[in-house]
Amino acid sequence: PNGGGKTTLMKIILGLLKPSAGKIQFFHQGKEVNEITMGYLPQYNTIDKKFPISVYEVVLSGLNKQKSLFCSFSKAQHDKVRETIARMGLEGLEQRAIGQLSGGQLQRTLLGRALVSNPEVVILDEPNTYIDKRFEARLYALLEEINKECAIVLVSHDIGTILQNVKSIACVNGTLDYHPDTEVSAEWLEAHFECPIELLGHGNLPHRILKCHHHEE
């Protein structure tokens, strides 16, 4: 739900915020490690689309941590940027300013920035916001391919779509409740979304909708 703490939790995992209590631990293949490499796609509405930067420069900025101070990017790094832009389906738009992009093009640009460094984990904060359903299907197909190379943590309010495209879910609403698969009941959803849920079926596609309910005054 809104205000449940999802984005805050992601920023703590990324090291952008410090936890007020407790600590963050990372594990790789069952063993605790000091850190892991991560890519991050922030919420769409946090991006300043008037900032004078091109598609190429945005994706290239994803390699900043791999570049020595006062040194130029290497040929191999520029090759990686071009490869990532092609993978995102953005060829021909390399020099276009982000303010001239459609919602889907901007999301793919930001996703390219998150992926160009070959991270072990990619965190996507509501990646399907402001994109149409046609591109949403392409986005999830692309994420399925990316998931073969790294882990993906995806934040979304769209429970109906999410359950068709993920392997496990966690509900964050003040506290975190992890569910190891996507076979969840209406009762589980109601308990965590704090409103009535009805499960419907249509062919092989599951749909989840809200029942009629009254808001408290």
Predicted regions and their residues:
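Catalytic Walker B motif of ABC-type/P-loop ATPase nucleotide-binding domains
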Residues: 122-126
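Conserved ABC transporter NBD signature motif
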Residues: 22-38
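ABC ATPase nucleotide-binding domains
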Residues: 183-217
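Helix-to-loop junction immediately C-terminal to a conserved catalytic motif
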Residues: 14
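H-loop (His-switch) and adjacent beta-strand-loop-beta switch element
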Residues: 167-182, 200
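Conserved ABC ATPase "signature" region
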Residues: 75-93
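Conserved ABC ATPase signature
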Residues: 97-101, 105
